[in-house]
Every structure is written in structure tokens, then in C-alpha cells.
Amino acid sequence: PLRLPYMFFFPGTTSVLFEVGLCVATYLTVLFIEFSVAPMEWLSCKFPFLKKWRKVVVRCTIILTIFGVCLSTLHQSSLGALYLIAPGKLHPLWYSPFMPMFFFVSSMAAGCSMVIFEGMWAHKGVHHYMDETHLREADEVVFSFSKAGAFILFGYFMLKLIDMLVQANLPYLCTGYGLWWLVEMLFFVLTPALLYAKGSRDRNIKLCRFASANAVLG
């Protein structure tokens, strides 16, 4: 970890890993600025000059959110691109020239699932501090993310299936690694997609939360 700042002093501008590190560092900076609104609210009582800074950050919330989303999409696809240069280190069932796209799509599914999963535990722990508006709209947020998660996971499943067939990797399914690939696709991609779809349709909040735990575990 002590060598992480090296990339800023000796930048390898032709390296994918440099782009990943730069995006992650910038992304963490944006997150820190967004989060600074909360501590500045009570620190401004002792340090009045922080009130002006807090107002500036609050006004830029939408811009910071858009910037953060763009940065997260960049480094997710770049992580997939890292594996393109090491085909010998991955089994053919997982290696694909479309790995940057797979990383990006799977990160969207993981994001939806983590919002539901973390929100579930936050709601249990601190729901008595939340206002009535938040408590009333919390379930609708879960159902919205569940719908999105169902579409994204099913799309990811179809993309992986098509890629496996196009690259003629079907014979590998009869091997030990093929069994693990089927476990991943069926139990940790297709199953939560179906659970999300059923939970959002039937408005079953417990089923949606269980699906999020399943997807996060996968």
C-alpha cells in the first residue's frame, strides 16, 4: 500500500492498470467530498467557515454524483481489460475478448444488489433515526433496484451463454471447471435474476432482500 502514490510520480500512461488506479483515486476523492457534507454539518458549529464550503458541496451534489458514476464505469471495464493480456491465467470458460463488457455489466448488477443488501442492514440498525418519508419510500426503492437487477442479471446470463457458445467452449462444461461455471451461472446469476423478478412483481420485500444476498454472495 505504501507504493500506491508511485503511479502519480512515475505515471505509466500506456498501462491499463494506471488508468484503473487513477480512476479509483479520483473516485475515492469524489466520495470523500460527497461524504464531507455530514461531518461539516456539526463541525461548522465550532468552525463557522465550514458553512460556506458545505453550501458549495451541496450545490454540486448532482455534478459530483454524475462524475462518480462515470468514474466507476471506467475502472470497472478497465479491470476486465487487464485480463485480456493474460489468456493463459484464465480458464477458457471465463476468458473472453469481451471481458471489459462483462466486468462492466456485472458491476451494475453488483451495485443494485449491494444497495439492497446494505440498505437492509442499515434499516434494521438505525430505522428509528429515519424520518417518515424515508421509511415510507424505502420499500419502493428496493423494488426499483430489484427490477433493474433482474434485467441486468438476466442480460449478463445471456451474454455469457452466447459468448460460451460462440467460442465453442461447450465441451468444457463436462469438466470440473465446467461444473463450477454452471454453479456460478445458475445459482449466482440466473437464480437471483428470477428471484428479483418474482419479488418485484409480487412486491415481496423479503424475497428481494434474499435475492440481493444471493447475488452479493456470488
Specify the residue positions occupied by each region the protein language model found.
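Long, contiguous internal "core" modules enriched in hydrophobic/ aromatic residues
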Residues: 9-201
